[in-house]
Amino acid sequence: MQTAAKLSALSLSLQKFSYRFAEQVLNSKLATKEEIEQVLLEPVPDIAKLSRPAFNELLLQRFVNRGWKSQPAVFDDPADPGARMDFLKERVGIEVGFGHASFIGIDLLKFQVASYSALDKIDVGVYVVTTGNFQKVMKSVLSQNWEGSLTFEKVKRYLPHFKSAIQVPIYVVGIDVQLVPTRPA
């Protein structure tokens, strides 16, 4: 087993899946799309300490610093349920799905509700998750347990089954990682 000390770097990359033409919608807001991808690919100060809560906190700081509204309510009426998206800017809603895989339905419904009826807050949702490979590397190389978290592969597999319930375009972004070995001295 490799350790973080034996690596020169862990390189982040993104896998993407466009549901209901989400990428085309985001391309009409190209600066916003590029900003999201830049935030997700920005180097992590210490990837060895990148637990789920630490990664959530890092993304919170990065998005808020770029003007994204944090934890906007899905419903406007205070008497309505307290559902919240993670981030909102320029009619793009972001949900970070680093939690348990069982939250997929709740997360997707937030996008649907925020896009329809009187709410009409978003044109597209961006669902940020990690890949199965990311979770495997984090556990085997860095001893960070991401087991049980939702994966990009699962969202990509499940989302088409929700086609009658989820009408809003959703851009699924899977954060992946590659090991970059050190060169012998």
Descriptions of predicted regions:
Residues 91, 98-100, 176:
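Short, flexible loop/turn elements at secondary-structure junctions
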Residues 120-131:
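Conserved beta-strand signature within the Rossmann-like core of class I S-adenosyl-L-methionine
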Residues 108-115, 156:
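Short, well-ordered amphipathic alpha-helices
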Residues 1-77:
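Acidic-basic catalytic patches of nuclease active cores, encompassing PD-(D/E)XK
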Residues 83-93, 118:
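Active-site beta-strand-loop-beta-strand hairpin of nuclease catalytic cores
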Residues 96-110:
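Active-site-adjacent loop/helix micro-motif of nuclease/hydrolase catalytic cores
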Residues 114-121, 161-165:
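Arginine/glycine-rich "motif VI" loop of SF2 helicases in the C-terminal RecA-like domain
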Residues 131-185:
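Domain-level recognition of nuclease-like catalytic cores that cleave nucleotide substrates
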